[in-house]
Amino acid sequence: MTHQTHAYHMVNPSPWPLTGALSALLMTSGLIMWFHFNSTALLMLGLTTNMLTMYQWWRDIIRESTFQGHHTPVVQKGLRYGMILFIISEVLFFTGFFWAFYHSSLAPTPELGGCWPPTGINPLNPLEVPLLNTSVLLASGVSITWAHHSLMEGNRSHMLQALFITITLGVYFTLLQASEYYEAPFTISDGVYGSTFFVATGFHGLHVIIGSTFLIVCFFRQLKFHFTSNHHFGFEAAAWYWHFVDVVWLFLYVSIYWWGS
C-alpha cells in the first residue's frame, strides 16, 4: 500500500456492487416469474447470488476494518453519517405506507361501505398475537441495549448473552408474524385494507429478518473478538437499525392493529 498523508480510506476496486445489483435484478425478476408462472428457479438463483455477495462483501469490509485498520475515527464518522441517512430514507419509505393507510381509513369511500375496516373484513384482535409481538420486540430492544452497554464496559460474556437473546426474540417475532399471516381471515387481495396491511407489516417483517441477519453476523464477529469498546461500528449500526425496526412496529401496532381495527 502506498503512503498516504490523510486518515481517509481509499477503497480498492470491488466486484460486489455489480454482483449485488445483478442479484437484485434476478430476485425482482424471479418474484415476477414466481407470481405469474409459479416458477421459483430465477428467484432461488437471485437469493443465492445475493447471499454470496453479502458474505464476500462483508468479509472484505471486516478485513479492511478489523485487520488492516482502514476504519480510522474519521472514516467511522463518515460511516455513522451514512447509516443515519440510510435510516432516514427508511423512515420515508415507511411513511408512504402509513400515508396510504390513513388516506384510505380516515375518509373511507362508498366502495368500502363508508366505514373502516371495510364491509366484510374481520380484523385481527390487537390484544392477541399483535400485542405479544409488541412485547417481544420491546424486550429485544432492551436486550440489544444491554449488549451495547456490556460491550462498552468490556464484558464479553454478557454481550454475547444479550445478543443471543436479541436474535432469539427476532426469530420468534418472525415465526409469530408468519403464523398470524397463515391464520389471517383476509388476504392481500381483499381490497385496500388487505393490501395496506400486508404490504406495511410484510415490509416490516422483511426488515426484522434483515436486522436479525445483521445481529447474527455481529454475534459471530464477537465470538472471534472483532469488537472492542472503542471500535465496534458494525455492531452499533446493527443496533441502530434494530431500534428503528422497534419504533416502526410501535407505529404499525397503534395505527393498523389497534386504531385500524
UniProtKB/Swiss-Prot annotation:
<keyword id="KW-1278">Translocase</keyword>
<feature type="topological domain" description="Mitochondrial intermembrane">
    <location>
        <begin position="35"/>
        <end position="40"/>
    </location>
</feature>
<dbReference type="InterPro" id="IPR024791">
    <property type="entry name" value="Cyt_c/ubiquinol_Oxase_su3"/>
</dbReference>
<keyword id="KW-0999">Mitochondrion inner membrane</keyword>
<dbReference type="InterPro" id="IPR000298">
    <property type="entry name" value="Cyt_c_oxidase-like_su3"/>
</dbReference>
<keyword id="KW-1133">Transmembrane helix</keyword>
<feature type="topological domain" description="Mitochondrial matrix">
    <location>
        <begin position="1"/>
        <end position="15"/>
    </location>
</feature>
<feature type="transmembrane region" description="Helical; Name=V">
    <location>
        <begin position="156"/>
        <end position="183"/>
    </location>
</feature>
<feature type="transmembrane region" description="Helical; Name=VII">
    <location>
        <begin position="233"/>
        <end position="256"/>
    </location>
</feature>
<dbReference type="GO" id="GO:0004129">
    <property type="term" value="F:cytochrome-c oxidase activity"/>
</dbReference>
<comment type="subunit">
    <text>Component of the cytochrome c oxidase (complex IV, CIV), a multisubunit enzyme composed of 14 subunits. The complex is composed of a catalytic core of 3 subunits MT-CO1, MT-CO2 and MT-CO3, encoded in the mitochondrial DNA, and 11 supernumerary subunits COX4I, COX5A, COX5B, COX6A, COX6B, COX6C, COX7A, COX7B, COX7C, COX8 and NDUFA4, which are encoded in the nuclear genome.</text>
</comment>
<feature type="topological domain" description="Mitochondrial matrix">
    <location>
        <begin position="224"/>
        <end position="232"/>
    </location>
</feature>
<comment type="function">
    <text>Component of the cytochrome c oxidase, the last enzyme in the mitochondrial electron transport chain which drives oxidative phosphorylation. The respiratory chain contains 3 multisubunit complexes succinate dehydrogenase (complex II, CII), ubiquinol-cytochrome c oxidoreductase (cytochrome b-c1 complex, complex III, CIII) and cytochrome c oxidase (complex IV, CIV), that cooperate to transfer electrons derived from NADH and succinate to molecular oxygen, creating an electrochemical gradient over the inner membrane that drives transmembrane transport and the ATP synthase.</text>
</comment>
<feature type="transmembrane region" description="Helical; Name=VI">
    <location>
        <begin position="191"/>
        <end position="223"/>
    </location>
</feature>
<feature type="topological domain" description="Mitochondrial intermembrane">
    <location>
        <begin position="184"/>
        <end position="190"/>
    </location>
</feature>
<dbReference type="Pfam" id="PF00510">
    <property type="entry name" value="COX3"/>
</dbReference>
<feature type="topological domain" description="Mitochondrial matrix">
    <location>
        <begin position="67"/>
        <end position="72"/>
    </location>
</feature>
<dbReference type="InterPro" id="IPR013833">
    <property type="entry name" value="Cyt_c_oxidase_su3_a-hlx"/>
</dbReference>
<dbReference type="InterPro" id="IPR033945">
    <property type="entry name" value="Cyt_c_oxase_su3_dom"/>
</dbReference>
<feature type="transmembrane region" description="Helical; Name=III">
    <location>
        <begin position="73"/>
        <end position="105"/>
    </location>
</feature>
<feature type="transmembrane region" description="Helical; Name=IV">
    <location>
        <begin position="129"/>
        <end position="152"/>
    </location>
</feature>
<keyword id="KW-0812">Transmembrane</keyword>
<feature type="topological domain" description="Mitochondrial matrix">
    <location>
        <begin position="153"/>
        <end position="155"/>
    </location>
</feature>
<protein>
    <recommendedName>
        <fullName>Cytochrome c oxidase subunit 3</fullName>
        <ecNumber>7.1.1.9</ecNumber>
    </recommendedName>
</protein>
<feature type="topological domain" description="Mitochondrial intermembrane">
    <location>
        <begin position="106"/>
        <end position="128"/>
    </location>
</feature>
<dbReference type="GO" id="GO:0045277">
    <property type="term" value="C:respiratory chain complex IV"/>
</dbReference>
<dbReference type="GO" id="GO:0008535">
    <property type="term" value="P:respiratory chain complex IV assembly"/>
</dbReference>
<keyword id="KW-0496">Mitochondrion</keyword>
<dbReference type="GO" id="GO:0005743">
    <property type="term" value="C:mitochondrial inner membrane"/>
</dbReference>
<comment type="similarity">
    <text>Belongs to the cytochrome c oxidase subunit 3 family.</text>
</comment>
<keyword id="KW-0472">Membrane</keyword>
<feature type="topological domain" description="Mitochondrial intermembrane">
    <location>
        <begin position="257"/>
        <end position="261"/>
    </location>
</feature>
<dbReference type="GO" id="GO:0006123">
    <property type="term" value="P:mitochondrial electron transport, cytochrome c to oxygen"/>
</dbReference>
<feature type="transmembrane region" description="Helical; Name=II">
    <location>
        <begin position="41"/>
        <end position="66"/>
    </location>
</feature>
<dbReference type="InterPro" id="IPR035973">
    <property type="entry name" value="Cyt_c_oxidase_su3-like_sf"/>
</dbReference>
<feature type="transmembrane region" description="Helical; Name=I">
    <location>
        <begin position="16"/>
        <end position="34"/>
    </location>
</feature>
